[in-house]
């Protein structure tokens, strides 16, 4: 196994340690390995999607971070043909949640998602989607 060193904000490390305690982990290293595996699986899942998709992108950001709201708006304008609706929620004094309803080519939706992920001030981004071709059975 390789040994690495990393810097984390104290609050993030405290929250991570709390999750590890709640889940009964005996080792922080094991928790980090599991978290990294989950991150890789989510990345692979996102890259394996193809075709037309419909879904939501949930974005949590610190609106006190200079320029983040403008950057998010600019990106959304660049991908407006894939965005059906946006809902904005004030979570706390500092944090906002945007839920973006998307539909279209998954490559463009993935591109949109990844551009928002890279922004400074954005703390969490999650894409959830399904194929537009999926048949939904209704009971009558």
Curated annotation (Swiss-Prot):
The keyword Secreted does not apply. Pfam families: NikR_C, RHH_1. It comes from the Archaea. Gene3D superfamilies: ACT-like. Chain A, domain 2 (3.30.70.1150), Met repressor-like (1.10.1220.10). Binds 1 nickel ion per subunit. The keyword DNA repair does not apply. Its cofactor is Ni(2+). InterPro entries: Acetolactate_synth/TF_NikR_C (IPR027271), ACT-like_dom_sf (IPR045865), Arc_rbn_hlx_hlx (IPR013321), CopG (IPR002145), CopG/NikR_regulator (IPR050192), Ni_resp_reg_NikR (IPR022988), Ribbon_hlx_hlx (IPR010985), TF_NikR_Ni-bd_C (IPR014864). One of its GO terms (biological process) is response to nickel cation. Ni(2+) binds at residues 77, 88, 90, 96. GO terms for molecular function: DNA binding; DNA-binding transcription factor activity; nickel cation binding. Keywords: DNA-binding, Metal-binding, Nickel, Transcription, Transcription regulation. Belongs to the transcriptional regulatory CopG/NikR family. PANTHER family: NICKEL-RESPONSIVE REGULATOR. This is Putative nickel-responsive regulator 2.
